[in-house]
C-alpha cells in the first residue's frame, strides 16, 4: 500500500474531495488512507467496521470503493451528517423543488419571526436578519417529506452556518478575534451549497449504498452488529488531548434543538463519548480505590500498575501548576473507556483480522 504522504494523518485531503468536504472537521485523517487499504476490495465480501464514525471519512470512502462498511457514532447530530453524506441517489428535480419551497416559506414567515426563538449563543454569532433566515430554513425542513432530501438539506444548512457568521465558526473552536468579511446572505449561500452538493453526487448516483451507520456508543457492543462479521477496523480514535467533542458541536446542536445548555451537552452528548476531556466528569465522583477494583483494572493489572504510577506523578506535578485540570483522573477514565472500545471492536471482527488505526 503506497499511501503514506505528509498529510495522511490530517483531514487536509478531505477539504478538496467531493462529499468528504461537505462537513469539515480538522481532527481527522485522509480519505486516501482508507482508499489505499481497500484498493482491490471492490465487490469482495469483506466488511469494514468504524467505531468512531465522526464525519464519515471511513464510511464514505468504503462506499466509493464499493465495500460494505458499518459504523457507530455517539452524537445524534453527527449521525444525521453521516447519513446525508451516504445518500447519493438524490432526485435533483425534487431537491430543487424543495429549495423553491424553502424560499417561499422564508418569505412568508420572515416578517412575523420572533427573535425570542433564537438561542442566546447564536445571537452573538450572527446578525438578526441572518438568524431569521437560518431559523426559518431550519423550520421549513420539517415540511420536507422525503427523509433523504431533508437530511441532505440539513447538512447544507449546517455548512451555511459556517459561511454566514459574523465570526469564523470553526470546528473545534469559535473564533471571535476577527470578523468575517462576507457574512450574511444566508439563503443565497444555502442555495449555492445545495447546488454544489447536487453536482458532487452526479457521478456517484449509480454507486450502491454499501455503508450503514448506527447511533451507538462503541464502549458497548452494538446488538445490530453480529459477532466476527467484520474484516477490517479503520478508524481514528479520540485522543487523550482534552478536546471536548461534546462542546465543539454546540453551535449546531443548540441551533437544531438537540441541546440548550451545558448540562444538556453533558447528558445528551458527553455521556455517549469516550472520556477525552476534563469536562466529561466531576472530580468529586472519582475514587482511585474504587477504580482499582473495577473490571478494567483487574483484567489489566500490569497496565493499571503503570497508569497508577503516572496518576500519582501527574497529581504531584499539578500541585506546582496554576491550572486546576485533573489530568490524572482524565487519563484513568480514557484508558478504561478505550479498553471497552477495543473489547467490543475485537468481538465484531474476525479473529486475526487486520486493524488499521
Q: What are these model-predicted stretches?
A:
Residues 44, 258-262, 349-354:
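Short glycine-dipeptide loop
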Amino acid at each position: 500500500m503506497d499511501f503514506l504522504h505528509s498529510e495522511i494523518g490530517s483531514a487536509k485531503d478531505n477539504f478538496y474531495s467531493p462529499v468528504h468536504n461537505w462537513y469539515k472537521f480538522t481532527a481527522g485523517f485522509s480519505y486516501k488512507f482508507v482508499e489505499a487499504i481497500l484498493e482491490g476490495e471492490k465487490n469482495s465480501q469483506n466488511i469494514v467496521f468504524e467505531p468512531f464514525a465522526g464525519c464519515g471519512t471511513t464510511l464514505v470512502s468504503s462506499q466509493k470503493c464499493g465495500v460494505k462498511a458499518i459504523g457507530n457514532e455517539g452524537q445524534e447530530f453527527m449521525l444525521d451528517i453521516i447519513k446525508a453524506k451516504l445518500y447519493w441517489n438524490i432526485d435533483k428535480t425534487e431537491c430543487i423543488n424543495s429549495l423553491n419551497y424553502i424560499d417561499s416559506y422564508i418569505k412568508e414567515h420572515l416578517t412575523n419571526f420572533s427573535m425570542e426563538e433564537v438561542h442566546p449563543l447564536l445571537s452573538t454569532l450572527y446578525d438578526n436578519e441572518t438568524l431569521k433566515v437560518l431559523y426559518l430554513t431550519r423550520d421549513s425542513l420539517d415540511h420536507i417529506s422525503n427523509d433523504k432530501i431533508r437530511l441532505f438539506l440539513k447538512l447544507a444548512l449546517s455548512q451555511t452556518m459556517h459561511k454566514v457568521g459574523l465570526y469564523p465558526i470553526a470546528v473545534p473552536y469559535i473564533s471571535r478575534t476577527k470578523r468575517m468579511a462576507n457574512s450574511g446572505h444566508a439563503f443565497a449561500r444555502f442555495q449555492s451549497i445545495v447546488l454544489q452538493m447536487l453536482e458532487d453526487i452526479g457521478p456517484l448516483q449509480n454507486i450502491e449504498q454499501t455503508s450503514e451507520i448506527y447511533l451507538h456508543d462503541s464502549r458497548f457492543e452494538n446488538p445490530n452488529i453480529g459477532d466476527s462479521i467484520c474484516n477490517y477496523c479503520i478508524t481514528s480514535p479520540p485522543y487523550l488531548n482534552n478536546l471536548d467533542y461534546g462542546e465543539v458541536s454546540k453551535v449546531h446542536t443548540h441551533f437544531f434543538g438537540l441541546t440548550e445548555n451545558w448540562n444538556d451537552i453533558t447528558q445528551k452528548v458527553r455521556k455517549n463519548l469516550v472520556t477525552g476531556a476534563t469536562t466529561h466528569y466531576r472530580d468529586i465522583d472519582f475514587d482511585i480505590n474504587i477504580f482499582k477494583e473495577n473490571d478494567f483494572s483487574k483484567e489489566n493489572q500490569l497496565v493499571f500498575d503503570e497508569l497508577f504510577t503516572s496518576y500519582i506523578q501527574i497529581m504531584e506535578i499539578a500541585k506546582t501548576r496554576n491550572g486546576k485540570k485533573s489530568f490524572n483522573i482524565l487519563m484513568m477514565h480514557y484508558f478504561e473507556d478505550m479498553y471497552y472500545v477495543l473489547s467490543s471492536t475485537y468481538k465484531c471482527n474476525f479473529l486475526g483480522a487486520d486493524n488499521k488505526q
